[in-house]
Structure formats: structure tokens, C-alpha cells
Amino acid sequence: MAGHSKWANIKHKKEKTDAQKGKLFTKLGRELMVVAKMYGPDPETNPKLRDVIAKAKANNMPMDKIMGFIKRAAGEIDTTGYEDITYEGYGPGGVAVIVEAMTNNRNRTAGELRHIFDKNGGNLGQTGCVSWMFSRKGVIVIEKESFPDEDFVMEKALEYGAEDFTSENGIYEIITSPEDFSKVREGLEKEGFTFIRAQIEMIPQTYVKLSSEDAQKMRRLIDMLEDNDDVKEVYHNWEEDEE
């Protein structure tokens, strides 16, 4: 379905291994420290930090660990030179791929990502080559099992300014404009909702199907990109088969 994130298209989320969780927490921890160091360690006065905290909580990072990273940022840790960079390219079968990274060495990161694309039947492209195929939106995902009253969830989401609400495959997916994301998320938090995903994403406007051979290459490409230490998020318009 066009205009919805991958959550609405995949019935079963794969459980992350302990190693994957550890790597994810390391990346989120670095993001927390950099944002806290650059814009201040108080979430009340740092909206960027509030958004990263929400993202970390949605990925099951314990609050004491989140606060530990923020406290470290107030110390002597060096976060200079880090910047957010977005890379664009193509996977096998012409799949559009967007990679969001945080790096302190853009040449190193670009070289590593180019190698990963080349190795898996894709190529790293120029800025703007595929981003026009995506829409930047806030995405909030809630498990139905935790909050079975669908009408109430939808009512509250729309009340706080959500653009769209869908209910399928055991989840509610709430879409917001990037500008209203924090307002909607914080409003729903005050109502007592918890999220399994809460962040601003690039959502494909159309999806591409792949042959089984290209699908294997694409899965490998995504896994290798996500495994890279500098990569925060990978977005694509491959229509994965439901398992």
C-alpha cells in the first residue's frame, strides 16, 4: 500500500538477536550522547533529545541506560565532528534505498557504503536520485494487544493532529507530518500509550517486487547496511513477501 511504512506491510517482525540488540543500543547511545552534547542534556529544553529518547524507548532500551548515555554526554566524552548524512542509491532490481548515517568521517562512511552496495548488486547514487520517491513522515506504531479499543486509539491520534491512522496485522500505525510528530507523540504518551516504533521516517510512495534471486541480494544488502556502525536507518521501496 502506497503511503504507509513497512510496518503496515509485514505481518511478522523478526526478533532481533542479542548481538543485533547490542549493536542497536550502541548506535542509539551514540545518537543520545551527540544530541545531548550538541543541544543540551535536558529533554525539557531539547526537543531533538526527546525524539531520540522516544526512539530508544520504542526499541526497548531501559530508561536507566538512556539516562546513563545522557549523563556521559555531560562529561568529557568527545562528540565533535559528528554529523548526520543521508546517502541514496539503488539495490538489485532498481529498488530505491535511502541510508541515514551519523559519522565523524564522511569519506570512511561513503567508502564503506559504496562497497556494500557494489557487493550486493546495487550502486550508491547522487543526492536526490531516489528521495523524490519517498515522503518524510512521523511514524508511531502501537501494538493492538496492549490497547484493544481501536476507536479510542484512533480518536486520540486524530485529536492530537495525526494525518492518518491504519489498523492491520496486529498493530495501529499512526502517520503524522514531520512538524507535528513530537506533538502527537507526546500527546499520546500523556494518554498512557506505549510504542513499538516512534520516529520520523522516509515512506515509499510505491513499492517494487523482486525475483527470489534479487530478493536474496536485497536482504543481504539491507543486513550489511544495518550492520555498519555509522548507519542509523535504512529505508527502501522493496515490497517484501510476508512470511
From Swiss-Prot:
One of its GO terms (cellular component) is cytosol. GO terms for biological process: regulation of DNA-templated transcription. Keywords: Cytoplasm, DNA-binding, Transcription, Transcription regulation. InterPro entries: Integrase-like_N, TACO1_YebC-like_2nd/3rd_dom, TACO1_YebC_N, Transcrip_reg_TACO1-like, Transcrip_reg_TACO1-like_dom3, YebC-like. It is found in: Cytoplasm. GO terms for molecular function: DNA binding. PANTHER family: TRANSCRIPTIONAL REGULATORY PROTEIN YEBC-RELATED (PTHR12532:SF6), TRANSLATIONAL ACTIVATOR OF CYTOCHROME C OXIDASE 1 (PTHR12532). Belongs to the TACO1 family. This is Probable transcriptional regulatory protein Athe_0816.
